[in-house]
Amino acid sequence: MVPVVGADSAGVRHSPAVVMVCHNYGCAKQAAVRVDTSTLWWIDDVLQASADAAAEREALSRVLAQLYRLAARQSPVGNDRAGNFLDDGVEGRMDCIDHATTSTRWLALLEARGMLRFHRVLEPARRTRFILQHFSAVVEVLAQEPAADAPALEPAMLAAAEHGAARYDVAPEHAQAPATVAGERFAIDAWFVDHGEPAVVLPLDEWLKGGGPNVH
């Protein structure tokens, strides 16, 4: 994550940043891509509209697509296609190492700017099947604090809420479990898609077992 320049050390949420984007397989080449203020404002608006962790992951999928499109205006990565075979030998092609590394850098920038409310960014994950290995960026769901102005819960409701089973305005017998829970991890994998398309988001356990589109 070191090759992120301007990661908001001064606390300026939307100041321009430079992210090193890997390409040509195995991060053989890197291009310095400038993320401008208007793009960061747009990203912030998209992410802050997310009401929960699931919505934030869907937003991150779209945000990564936009960042890769931005990178294509400053580097040859617009030539990248899903998997490895469709763009073999093409300048700007990206394998899973390029995508996992670059996506993690994009996500780390957003995290450093305080734009992620429901997730934290982890190191890339690796899966191995037979003699092949594959990498992806990963995020983890954060524990959520109750709103400051939320009414106090009755003891029974509080106990249920601690296990994600109830809210103060829902009777315990009708409460639904949240779509995701704190500590759950998800792969955000842009290698599966053509350049500029939303990244594939999968539970990490499913991804580790070989989940995802059938591309090569």
Which role fits each region the language model picked out?
Residues 1-16:
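Bacterial Sec signal peptide processing site at the extreme N-terminus
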Residues 51-54, 58, 71, 75-78, ...:
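Hydrophobic alpha-helical membrane segments
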Residues 108-205:
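Hydrophobic/aromatic-rich core segments of domains that either
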Residues 22-54, 80-89:
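Acidic/histidine-rich, surface-exposed loop or edge segments in extracytoplasmic proteins
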Residues 59-119:
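Mid-length scaffold segments of soluble, non-membrane domains
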Residues 16-25, 54-65:
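Short, mixed-charge, low-aromatic patches
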Residues 200-216:
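Low-complexity, Gly/Ser/Thr/Pro-rich intrinsically disordered linker/tail segments
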